[in-house]
Amino acid sequence: MAKEELVEFGGKVSEVLPDNRFRVTLENGFEVWAYSSGRLKRNRIRILAGDRVTLEMSPYDLTKGRINYRHKF
């Protein structure tokens, strides 16, 4: 069984929540919950409110996502 394709979105972190979770406003205006990927945790990349990020989301649940990249300015 093949793994489903993930959908990528760009957005901006609007709020930092407890337990390494974030509220992200997407470029199209929707707000979603997101968590940082294992690579970001392993390399200790900090994500703050106002950072631009790239999210991966499942096409089946577009309310949650995984942050896989923090843009530099």
From Swiss-Prot:
MF (Gene Ontology): ribosome binding; rRNA binding; translation initiation factor activity
Chief localization: cytoplasm
Protein's job: One of the essential components for the initiation of protein synthesis. Stabilizes the binding of IF-2 and IF-3 on the 30S subunit to which N-formylmethionyl-tRNA(fMet) subsequently binds. Helps modulate mRNA selection, yielding the 30S pre-initiation complex (PIC). Upon addition of the 50S ribosomal subunit IF-1, IF-2 and IF-3 are released leaving the mature 70S translation initiation complex.
Official protein name in the record: Translation initiation factor IF-1 2
Residue ranges annotated for the S1-like domain, each copy included: 1-72
InterPro entries registered for this protein in UniProt: NA-bd_OB-fold, RNA-binding_domain_S1_IF1, TIF_IF1
Assembly and oligomerization: Component of the 30S ribosomal translation pre-initiation complex which assembles on the 30S ribosome in the order IF-2 and IF-3, IF-1 and N-formylmethionyl-tRNA(fMet); mRNA recruitment can occur at any time during PIC assembly.
Gene Ontology CC: one annotated term: cytosol
Keywords attached to this entry: Cytoplasm, Initiation factor, Protein biosynthesis, RNA-binding, rRNA-binding
Pfam families: eIF-1a
Native source organism of the sequence: Cupriavidus pinatubonensis (strain JMP 134 / LMG 1197) (Cupriavidus necator (strain JMP 134))
UniProt record similarity statement: Belongs to the IF-1 family.
SUPFAM superfamilies, A to Z: Nucleic acid-binding proteins
Compartment(s): Cytoplasm
